[in-house]
Amino acid sequence: GTTQFLMNELKSACPEADTRFLSFYDMKIDDEGIPLADGSHATLLYRLHPMELLIDEQTPDNEPLGEMFLDLYEENRFALFNPPEAIILQNKSFMSLVYALYLTDQFFTKPDRDIIERYLAPSYFENDFSSLDDGLYIQKEIWGREGRHVQVVQKHGDTSELYMEKLVDNYDDIICRDSKKVMYQDFIQQKRFTHTVDCGVKDGFLTLSCFMLGDQASAVGCRFSPEEIAGTEAYFVPLLIE
């Protein structure tokens, strides 16, 4: 699927590179790194396996495969695209931390604060929810994926009630780490769009994603969903820059 598509694209872009597909569960580890079938070792990997799950992976003999993999990376036995540091951004409470620091007016520069104010919905830790004003808030699991367990709640004083919930058809197929905490964001009403998909014309909502390389924007992606809370039902939308 996605992994093989990326492999083929890399082969096209870098035909001189020896690019191979290897399932994480077929991977072997030795003191030198990750051995391949011809006796060589992998020097650069593109990781798609979710980091929050990888760290707990074990072999059939109950050896800590994930920990051994990360130890080898720390020893510079191989390099990684999408490295372990990415786990910081995968935890949704990171947005709560950024917004909390923004509110102090002591941590970010003026340009940083302008970017946060424009692009980050006000975000809060679970422990701060009781002190927020009454209104609508989005509740998200900190390790949630594909809209799983996303709810919109109506806060009334010290209590809250369900206003909207994301119902996921393929709940059991969504692989993610169990979350013991949630975070909250202000509910911001989205604009509605009409889009033609494979089954006809639908009314729904757009989600834009910006991919960064360092501090530079490298690409923009767009998804369309008939639902306000997008999940696996969303369609990828082609973008045209005029």
List the model feature ranges, each with a label.
Residues G1-E242:
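Domain-scale recognition of functional cores that engage charged ligands
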